[in-house]
Amino acid sequence: MWLKSEGFALGKGGVEDGRHEVLYNRAISTWFDVQVGVRTDLDSGTSRQWAALGVRGMLPHFVEMEATAYASDNGHFAARIGLHYDLRLTQRWVLQPEIDLNVYSKTDPGRHVGSGLASLDAGVRLRYEITRKFAPYVGVTYSGRYGQTARFARQESEAATAVQVVFGIRSWF
């Protein structure tokens, strides 16, 4: 079972890009798992619930991949593809470059998302593994919104691209 939660806290008390998933995970080979479950988008925009079906695993050269397809109750479809690589600097320090792409089948004005390639996030995180299951991290991320998604951002007086400093805690149990 996987519980995934991601979002950005805004200075004015809101949440942006709040994405929460509960997924059942099953190994289908030595290197890959299939995941099925639900995703809920909760933030200052319109809430949306999705059914999720995905694959995650290890590609050659130890690149971790995650690809998930989503279908909502109102006929919207989406896909999220992510790649990252753990570069061990020492036994505890890990540098992790990563890239995530989000694609949508339809424009969704309530969520300020356009069809096609909606966003790309690329960055690098440095984490210190206190234990393998608990590691604080700090990093820098480039976030780009494209097409109609970028136009929605500009209508709200937001930038279509941004570079952000991120920090958090990575944990699993």
Please provide the spans of the model-predicted regions.
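Transmembrane beta-strands of outer-membrane beta-barrel pores
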Residues: 7-11, 38-44, 59-61, 69-73, ...
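Hydrophobic, lipid-facing positions within transmembrane beta-strands of outer-membrane proteins
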Residues: 18-22, 49-53, 63, 77-81, ...
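Repeated loop/turn-to-beta-strand initiation elements of outer-membrane beta-barrel proteins
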Residues: 1-3, 30-35, 61-65, 90-95, ...
